[in-house]
Amino acid sequence: PGLVVDCYNDILVTQISNTGMEQHKQMIYDILLEVFKENGHIIQAIYERNDIKVREKEGLTSYKGFYYNPNNISPQTIINENGIQLQVDIENGQKTGYFLDQKSNRVLLRNIARNKRVLDCFSHTGGFALNAAYGNAKAVTAVDVSNVALQQGYQNAKLNHLEDKIQFVQADVFDYLEQLKDNEFDI
C-alpha cells in the first residue's frame, strides 16, 4: 500500500505511509488531478492526512493540512452516500474523515434492518446507525466513547430527519456490552 486516496465531492484526501510514495507525491497528485479532470470531475483541493504513527517507522514526519487549495475551501463537507447526507470532517475525522470502505456494508445493514433492534458499536459519526434507521429498523442505538463523534452522529441524524429514530449513548462499548440483557438487540 503506502497510499490511500479518498474523494469527498471535490476534495481528495490522501494518506501517505511510506517513503517511496512521499518522494513521488507531486507526480502522484498531478496524475490524480489529471485523471479526475479527464473523467469530468474537477478537484478543488487536496488535503493530506499524514498524521499516522506508521510514518515514524519510515522516518517521515507526521502532519496534516491542505497541499492544494486555491479556492480556500473548508475541510468540512457534506457527502451523499446512497441517499443519506453525511457531514465529513476531513481535518479531524478518523482515517481520511470517514470510513468510505464500509459503504457496501452500511447498505447491507440498511437492507436487513427492517423491524429489527440494531446496535451500532463504535458508531463514530453514525454511518451504520443512520442506514439502519433509514432501513426502518424498529430501534437503533449508537454507542461510542467519543462525545464529539456522537455529536457529529446526532447532527448527521438531524440532517436526514432521523434524530428521533436513533438513541446515541456515550459509553465504553465493552462496558456497555457487559450490561446488556440477552437478546436485547437483533443486529
Predicted regions and their residues:
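Short glycine-rich loop/turn motifs that provide flexible caps or phosphate-binding loops at active sites
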Residues: 1, 9, 58, 125-126, ...
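Conserved catalytic micro-motifs used in adenylation/nucleotidyl-transfer and phosphoryl/amide-
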Residues: 1-25
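Non-catalytic substrate-recognition/targeting regions of SAM-dependent transferases
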Residues: 4-6, 26-98
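Anionic group-transfer/hydrolysis microenvironments
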Residues: 8, 17, 50-51, 91, ...
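Glycine-rich nucleotide phosphate-binding loop and flanking beta-alpha elements
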Residues: 20, 54, 125
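Short, charged, low-complexity patches
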Residues: 21-25, 29, 102, 106
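Rossmann-like S-adenosyl-L-methionine
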Residues: 71-187
